[in-house]
Amino acid sequence: MKNSLFAKTFAALILSSFLVLSAGTANAKRLTAAVADWTGGELTCQVAVAILEEELGYRIDRIEFASGTGLWEAIAAGDIDFACESWPSYAEADDVMLNTNLIYDGEVVKEYSGDGSVDAYTTGIIGMSDYYVPKYFVDANPDFKDWSDLNKYKDQFATPETGSKGRLIGCPVAGWNCHDQKRLDLLGIDFQADELGTEAAAIAEAVAAYERKEPFLLYLWEPHWFFGAYDMVGVKLPAHKTCDSFTEANNWKDCGTAAWPATGWAKDYTFNYGNPATFAKPENAKAAEFFTKMKFDNADQAVMLVEVKQKNRDLKEVVKEWKDANPDKWKNWIPK
């Protein structure tokens, strides 16, 4: 009888605990997030998800969903609650996304297609492209300040293939329309752009030169794992500027050396984005405030990219490690 009473009491306690846990799970604040289809975006989203779940009590359901117009439409329809790290220049290339409200070169968007169906929140990740030299080259040549000094040192960048000209390890794919040689010519930089065909080939050349401690000039963009592994300095190309006239035959905007492609690239102020109706709900007020405060940065992402892409570490483990080591950063994103 005593054992029977104990068994019944124990069973009741187990059932009670199960019901409490079930109720807690059922009542948990839930959101659905699209998992980015590139590593940088996945890192940014996992940082957000980890904080939403561990600090703000949300349960996040993750769905793999390719970036692009379909994702914007899924968020606008309420099928997905939020996604992370959209790049405006990528969106700009899509006909459906052509509008004047992009976060591009400092211009902040607050709505999708002008109808307010998607809200956007800047991430802190800023896409930047430039030509870069190793810091050891700058340290060895303290008079080198920016792109305008490249010709003074072109002999150090010359190769048997370029003769008296310096060499630029250029934008690797012609389809990206970087116009490296046109830019060099318009700016009077006596270098030859070398297009290697793939990002991997360009990076391999740069890594080999870095390990030999040779000077090299490299086209690259941030954030990128390369900057988490190697110390590089941008040459500060002239600030991005465009003009209205467009020369189709040359595929570049023809308005002299004051504008593209003689200037550098526009900055991409990337953003997280979500469904306004979802984040207008009282139970999601803290999540909405969190996204307005979240400010991840290029340097942190670059270091994490090295761990994931070069060391093949688990992405969630790398994010947890970053979160544990950087409470002074992410705690400022938590609503009061």
Regions found by a protein language model. Name each.
Residues 106-168:
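A conserved helix-loop-strand patch within extracytoplasmic ligand-binding domains
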Residues 28-40, 58-64, 165-169, 291:
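Short, well-ordered beta-strand elements
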